[in-house]
């Protein structure tokens, strides 16, 4: 099949440049102003790494960063486990009584406003505390449970879309050779959906790290996440330390994202080569 000719248009290039400018110019300005020596974030006074130094000596900021990263990592991991199970049920179990309701309940958090989700979870935790005495206090645990609730929906959608594209003949061949369903899943299915699992984990991690509304409802005294601290700081005036912290997060996320993309692309190419080699053999 002949490749379609690529039509290059100045208008298309201009629109592309404008789009990327709107996306990445604010990030570039953020990184530049993180090296501003002035306390006023909008007034340039020269290059300095002062705010990076003060950032690491700010106990409240470091505590919020540690709490947010811990919750995000744990929530993303649990969301991947639950999301994989949910995707397996939706894709592999076919039609069963209540399948539509199950799929709706899994994906409902995708279209639910954060305010409604946060309020509903708050009422749930308060009711449980009155009924069984748990949770005794709202804090890291309640935030983690809330983040797992809505992150699982995103992970399930990502993994289920990948599972629908898989060639089931490989799994069926393994079962014909005597492999148990559990062994087939861990040896064949899981490696093939691993790029989607990694993508889902990164997406869930980002969503959890970025959440403000839901965490504000279900958090308690002493459990202040990074978005909550940043939002409260911005209301009283933008702290230059926030620019430094945001620049570090951008750099880390960019590096991790590139590494994940590279590893997934290499794994996908290797998987395609292995399948082609197996079919030829």
Q: How would you name each of these model-derived features?
A:
Residues 14-15, 20-27, 155-167, 179-210:
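Transmembrane alpha-helices
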Residues 2-8, 39, 52-61, 209-262, ...:
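Interhelical loop and adjacent transmembrane-helix boundary motif
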Residues 40-45, 49, 54, 115-148, ...:
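Membrane-interfacial helix termini and adjacent extracytoplasmic/periplasmic loops
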Residues 25-28, 32, 81-85, 119, ...:
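Membrane-embedded alpha-helices of multi-pass transport/permease systems
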Residues 20, 63-70, 124-152, 196, ...:
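Loop-to-helix entry region at the N-terminal start of transmembrane alpha-helices
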Residues 2-14, 90, 94-98, 160-175, ...:
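C-terminal transmembrane helix and the adjacent membrane-cytosol boundary/short C-terminal tail
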Residues 35, 59-90:
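Transmembrane alpha-helix signature in integral membrane proteins
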């Amino acid at each position: 099949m002949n490749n379609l000719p690529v039509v290059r248009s100045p208008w298309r290039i201009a629109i592309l440049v404008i789009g990327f400018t709107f996306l990445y110019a604010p990030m570039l300005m953020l990184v530049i102003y993180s090296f501003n020596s002035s306390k006023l974030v909008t007034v340039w006074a020269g290059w300095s790494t002062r705010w990076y130094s003060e950032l690491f000596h700010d106990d409240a900021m470091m505590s919020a960063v540690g709490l947010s990263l811990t919750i995000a990592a744990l929530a993303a991991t649990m969301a991947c486990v639950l999301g994989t199970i949910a995707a397996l049920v939706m894709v592999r179990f076919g039609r069963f009584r209540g399948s539509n309701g199950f799929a709706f309940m899994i994906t409902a958090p995708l279209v639910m406003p954060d305010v409604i989700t946060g309020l509903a979870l708050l009422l749930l935790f308060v009711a449980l505390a009155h009924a069984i005495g748990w949770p005794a206090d709202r804090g890291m645990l309640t935030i983690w449970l809330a983040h797992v609730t809505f992150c699982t929906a995103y992970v399930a959608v990502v993994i289920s879309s990948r599972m629908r594209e898989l060639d089931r003949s490989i799994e069926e061949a393994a079962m014909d050779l005597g492999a148990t369903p559990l062994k087939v899943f861990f040896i064949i299915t899981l490696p093939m959906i691993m790029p989607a699992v990694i993508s889902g984990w990164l997406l869930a991690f980002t969503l959890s790290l970025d959440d403000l509304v839901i965490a504000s409802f279900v958090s308690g005294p002493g459990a202040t996440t990074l978005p909550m601290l940043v939002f409260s700081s911005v209301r009283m005036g933008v702290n230059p330390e926030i620019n430094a912290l945001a620049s570090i997060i951008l750099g880390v996320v960019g590096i991790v994202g590139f590494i994940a993309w590279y590893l997934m692309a290499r794994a996908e190419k290797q998987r395609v080569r292995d399948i082609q080699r197996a079919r030829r053999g």
